[in-house]
Protein backbone atom coordinates (compact mmCIF):
# COMPACT_ATOMS: atom_id res chain seq x y z
CA UNK A 1 0.00 0.00 0.00
CA UNK A 2 1.28 3.47 -0.83
CA UNK A 3 0.26 6.64 0.98
CA UNK A 4 0.39 9.96 -0.81
CA UNK A 5 -0.16 12.03 2.32
CA UNK A 6 2.76 14.46 2.61
CA UNK A 7 4.54 14.30 5.96
CA UNK A 8 6.52 17.16 7.53
CA UNK A 9 9.15 16.32 10.16
CA UNK A 10 10.59 19.11 12.28
CA UNK A 11 13.96 17.69 13.30
CA UNK A 12 16.31 15.48 11.30
CA UNK A 13 18.16 14.06 14.29
CA UNK A 14 17.85 10.62 15.85
CA UNK A 15 14.08 10.75 16.32
CA UNK A 16 13.30 12.43 12.98
CA UNK A 17 15.46 9.97 11.03
CA UNK A 18 13.83 6.96 12.68
CA UNK A 19 10.34 8.35 12.13
CA UNK A 20 11.16 8.81 8.44
CA UNK A 21 12.49 5.26 8.10
CA UNK A 22 9.33 3.85 9.70
CA UNK A 23 7.10 6.00 7.50
CA UNK A 24 8.91 4.79 4.39
CA UNK A 25 8.36 1.21 5.52
CA UNK A 26 4.65 1.94 5.88
CA UNK A 27 4.46 3.28 2.32
CA UNK A 28 4.69 7.04 2.82
CA UNK A 29 6.10 8.59 -0.38
CA UNK A 30 6.52 12.30 0.49
CA UNK A 31 8.62 13.42 3.46
CA UNK A 32 9.97 16.91 4.15
CA UNK A 33 12.58 17.53 6.86
CA UNK A 34 13.06 20.89 8.59
CA UNK A 35 16.27 21.35 10.59
CA UNK A 36 18.93 24.01 10.97
CA UNK A 37 21.77 21.86 12.34
CA UNK A 38 24.74 20.25 10.67
CA UNK A 39 25.75 16.63 11.17
CA UNK A 40 28.34 16.36 13.95
CA UNK A 41 30.79 13.52 14.53
CA UNK A 42 28.66 12.01 17.30
CA UNK A 43 25.55 11.81 15.10
CA UNK A 44 26.17 8.90 12.68
CA UNK A 45 26.14 6.26 15.43
CA UNK A 46 22.65 7.38 16.51
CA UNK A 47 21.10 8.81 13.36
CA UNK A 48 20.24 6.16 10.81
CA UNK A 49 20.34 8.55 7.85
CA UNK A 50 23.76 10.15 8.38
CA UNK A 51 27.31 8.89 7.90
CA UNK A 52 30.77 9.92 9.07
CA UNK A 53 31.43 11.70 5.76
CA UNK A 54 28.40 13.93 6.36
CA UNK A 55 30.00 15.16 9.59
CA UNK A 56 33.37 15.63 7.92
CA UNK A 57 31.73 17.83 5.27
CA UNK A 58 29.48 19.64 7.82
CA UNK A 59 26.42 18.78 5.77
CA UNK A 60 23.02 19.88 6.99
CA UNK A 61 20.97 17.29 8.85
CA UNK A 62 17.84 17.92 6.80
CA UNK A 63 19.71 17.75 3.50
CA UNK A 64 21.58 14.62 4.58
CA UNK A 65 18.42 12.84 5.71
CA UNK A 66 16.49 13.72 2.54
CA UNK A 67 19.35 12.55 0.31
CA UNK A 68 19.70 9.31 2.28
CA UNK A 69 16.00 8.51 1.84
CA UNK A 70 16.39 8.97 -1.92
CA UNK A 71 19.41 6.63 -1.97
CA UNK A 72 17.46 4.03 0.00
CA UNK A 73 14.33 4.33 -2.14
CA UNK A 74 14.71 6.46 -5.29
CA UNK A 75 10.93 6.81 -5.81
CA UNK A 76 10.44 8.76 -2.58
CA UNK A 77 9.88 12.50 -2.75
CA UNK A 78 12.08 13.74 0.09
CA UNK A 79 12.82 17.41 0.60
CA UNK A 80 14.98 19.41 3.00
CA UNK A 81 14.41 22.86 4.44
CA UNK A 82 17.08 24.57 6.51
CA UNK A 83 15.91 27.50 8.57
CA UNK A 84 16.32 28.99 12.02
CA UNK A 85 13.57 30.34 14.24
CA UNK A 86 14.59 31.63 17.67
CA UNK A 87 12.97 30.30 20.81
CA UNK A 88 9.98 32.31 22.05
CA UNK A 89 11.14 35.12 24.29
CA UNK A 90 14.63 35.28 22.79
CA UNK A 91 15.53 38.63 21.30
CA UNK A 92 16.60 39.17 17.72
CA UNK A 93 18.28 42.14 16.12
CA UNK A 94 16.49 44.48 13.75
CA UNK A 95 18.61 43.14 10.90
CA UNK A 96 17.25 39.62 11.54
CA UNK A 97 13.56 40.57 11.48
CA UNK A 98 13.01 40.25 7.73
CA UNK A 99 14.66 36.82 7.61
CA UNK A 100 12.61 35.68 10.61
CA UNK A 101 9.38 36.83 8.95
CA UNK A 102 10.31 34.88 5.79
CA UNK A 103 11.10 31.76 7.83
CA UNK A 104 7.84 31.95 9.81
CA UNK A 105 5.90 32.42 6.56
CA UNK A 106 7.69 29.38 5.11
CA UNK A 107 6.77 27.33 8.18
CA UNK A 108 3.13 28.39 7.76
CA UNK A 109 3.22 27.26 4.12
CA UNK A 110 4.93 23.96 4.96
CA UNK A 111 2.40 23.08 7.65
CA UNK A 112 -0.50 24.04 5.38
CA UNK A 113 0.83 21.82 2.57
CA UNK A 114 1.48 18.68 4.62
CA UNK A 115 -1.20 16.38 6.00
CA UNK A 116 0.85 15.08 8.94
CA UNK A 117 3.37 17.01 11.06
CA UNK A 118 5.87 15.49 13.50
CA UNK A 119 7.72 17.61 16.04
CA UNK A 120 10.90 15.56 16.54
CA UNK A 121 13.17 18.12 18.15
Predicted feature locations:
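Adenine nucleotide-associated cytosolic modules
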Residues: 1-121
Amino acid sequence: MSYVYPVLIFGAGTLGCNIARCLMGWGVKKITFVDNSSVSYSNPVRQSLSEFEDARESRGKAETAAAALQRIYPSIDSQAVRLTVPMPGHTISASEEAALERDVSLIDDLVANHDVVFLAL
